[in-house]
Curated annotation (Swiss-Prot):
Listed GO CC annotations: cytoplasm; nucleus; perinuclear region of cytoplasm
Organism: Sus scrofa
Name assigned to this protein: Ankyrin repeat domain-containing protein 1
Its biological purpose: May play an important role in endothelial cell activation. May act as a nuclear transcription factor that negatively regulates the expression of cardiac genes.
Gene transcribed to yield this protein: ANKRD1
Record Gene3D superfamilies: Ankyrin repeat-containing domain (1.25.40.20)
Keyword annotations from UniProtKB, A to Z: ANK repeat, Coiled coil, Nucleus, Repeat
Any one GO molecular-function label of the UniProt entry: titin binding
SMART domains xrefs: ANK (SM00248)
Amino acid sequence: MMVLKVEELVTGKKNGGGDAGEFLPEDFRDGEYEAAVTLEKQEDLKTLPAHFVSLGEQQWKIEKEREAELKKKKLEQRSKLENLEDLEIIIQLKKRKKYRKTKVPVVKEPEPEVITEPVDVPRFLKAALENKLPVVEKFLSDKNNPDVCDEYKRTALHRACLEGHLAIVEKLIEAGAQIEFRDMLESTAIHWASRGGNLDVLKLLLNKGAKISARDKLLSTALHVAVRTGHYECAEHLIACEADLNAKDREGDTPLHDAVRLNRYKMIRLLITYGADLNVKNCAGKTPMDLVLNWQNGTKAIFDSLKENSYKASRIATF
């Protein structure tokens, strides 16, 4: 019995001997290359004289041939891709298999924090900012003043309103926190909720009696603040609650002045839709329309300058 060469195995060509152990091209169809390689490795045994093959080796050879035959049958049973539908089916099966293997992580809910020691003012104010309700509850349960504040007169309510921590806002109000308490710039909770863009907190404050007309040190209303910070939903809700569309701040600017100056198109459209006055003048004698024209003229001047500089540069480049 002759030994197959590697090139004979790969090409499937026969040599002149025509032994029964050799492979033909049809042996390599349908992905049977691996099975053929396994059989080729077993051909080495046939090169030994018959008297050198022990009983144990014969048994090992039979087992290997059986394994190769099983592998060949498995290869023959694989689906053949005849069209795109077959490919789609295989893709879907692989996806399902992958999905079955993927373990859904079990998310454990954090255990409620139990506070036993007294809570001081700095920790209380920080807890309101970071939404740590157990700390806030412990501070309030010890009959402490909910309106304690920092060096800028900002209370826990101000901080919670800014961050949108609704549960803490509710707890503070239940404990008697003053909704109209003013910080160093005379901002109230409604200003802070508008600044943070927290609609649910804003609604709660208004339902609890917060003054929609409250003004800070710059005479800004909550609507001014919502427009400046770009919180559309808060501005819309304040308008729906009859906030003054034409209220002037210390510089005489209305919310529409601010919207035009900051080029907030959606705010401009909202305010005009609900009837904001286009002709109200600020302390500089400018109406919102004047600001639009100034902005357009300023933009035009910038483009004219860029155009002129570009022309000069091109002229220099030609020389």
